[in-house]
């Protein structure tokens, strides 16, 4: 008898998970449609939906004008996307950026704070927590926080090594934030989150093998292989580090140009590149040459990634993706000349928001796993 009871309980949980996944797809559905899609009886579907309504994971939709027919109108349901919120945070050397989203991934608020690469680790932690607290739309609804950070991040959320922010090396980031934030906290490498965002809502949607090239105040890579994020055996996949002279020297031409034209202004590498791009768009031939030299340096480095990995797509992302054809076209021409199977090269439309948006997706994925496990 206990075995029968246990089997029935397990079956109900499996059916609940199936119905919740259907609702999670975003469509408005009737009980009949739910029952058919989940392959359960209509009474079973109705009982599960009532339970999901009580737990606020589902909501009943109002009847739309023109729906009324003879008899009782069909009840219609959808996933209750506003029942909770998640926050995605991009921790960079020069900025902290947060995005608050509902469970459907709709962005509710965005906040940005400028920081210095030399900021001590303890102060950076405080700034992250303060940003999260400021980003909370409704404290009762906050369900998870995900953080993307530069550097090698292991499975425990520890920053094993960070070239861009040396002070960050060795910080137990997930553990430190979990002590200060009262909801589940996830930590991942920023470049992996950037390519995740592109695959979710960017130019890489529908692609399975993608190289994401980050261009900002530094250079980084994110890899999607076979439709999955590639972390590597030491979670160091995509790290350029300080051994790649080609990438370290990539900024030299745009920095030299900016210092020559406007020597009184102190700029970061990314700001120097942005300055050169802006001047190139205005018709400055010297600026255009500096930007093309920058693009070719990037392309030379990409060759060593593209030939062995054979991706379908290269996404040029980060703050400098706004350069568009000024970066993309020289890179595409070089890859066309020297790679076995040249991938398409495109500029990201997400710009500097990709890491925070990828963190939102990571938090939502965590909630989905938790929710379906609890249901099933």
Question: What is the role of each PLM region?
Answer:
Residues 1-114, 118-141, 181, 201, ...:
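ATP-binding/phosphotransfer module of carbohydrate and carboxylate kinases, centering on a glycine-rich
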Residues 89, 103, 141-148, 152-249, ...:
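Phosphate-binding/catalytic loop of phosphoryl-transfer enzymes
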């Amino acid at each position: 008898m206990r075995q029968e009871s246990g089997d029935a309980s397990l079956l109900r949980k499996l059916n609940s998970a199936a119905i919740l996944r259907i609702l999670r797809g975003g469509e408005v559905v009737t009980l009949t449609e739910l029952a058919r899609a989940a392959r359960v009886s209509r009474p079973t579907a109705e009982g599960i939906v009532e339970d999901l309504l009580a737990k606020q994971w589902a909501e009943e939709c109002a009847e739309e004008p023109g729906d009324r027919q003879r008899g009782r109108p069909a009840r219609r349901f959808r996933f209750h996307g506003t029942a909770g919120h998640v926050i995605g945070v991009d921790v960079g050397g020069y900025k902290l950026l947060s995005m608050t989203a509902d469970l459907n991934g709709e962005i509710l608020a965005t906040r940005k704070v400028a920081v210095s690469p030399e900021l001590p680790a303890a102060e950076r932690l405080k700034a992250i927590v303060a940003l999260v607290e400021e980003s909370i739309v409704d404290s009762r609804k906050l369900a998870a926080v995900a953080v993307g950070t530069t550097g090698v991040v292991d499975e425990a959320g520890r920053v094993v090594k960070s070239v861009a922010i040396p002070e960050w090396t060795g910080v137990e980031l997930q553990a430190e934030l979990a002590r200060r934030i009262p909801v589940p906290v996830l930590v991942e490498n920023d470049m992996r989150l950037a390519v995740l965002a592109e695959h979710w809502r960017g130019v890489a949607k529908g692609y399975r093998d993608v190289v994401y090239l980050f261009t900002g105040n530094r250079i980084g890579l994110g890899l999607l292989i076979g439709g999955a994020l590639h972390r590597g055996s030491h979670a160091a996949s995509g790290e350029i580090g300080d051994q790649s002279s080609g990438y370290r020297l990539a900024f030299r031409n745009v920095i030299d140009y900016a210092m020559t034209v406007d020597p009184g202004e102190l700029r970061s590498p990314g700001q120097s590149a942005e300055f050169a791009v802006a001047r190139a768009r205005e018709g400055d031939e010297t600026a255009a040459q500096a930007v093309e030299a920058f693009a070719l340096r990037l392309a030379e480095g990409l060759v060593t990634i593209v030939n062995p990995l054979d991706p379908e797509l290269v996404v040029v992302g980060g703050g400098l993706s706004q350069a568009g054809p000024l970066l993309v076209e020289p890179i595409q021409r070089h890859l066309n000349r020297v790679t076995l199977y040249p991938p398409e090269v495109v500029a990201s439309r997400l710009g500097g928001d990709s890491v925070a948006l990828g963190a939102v997706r990571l938090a939502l994925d965590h909630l989905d796993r938790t929710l379906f496990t609890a249901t099933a």
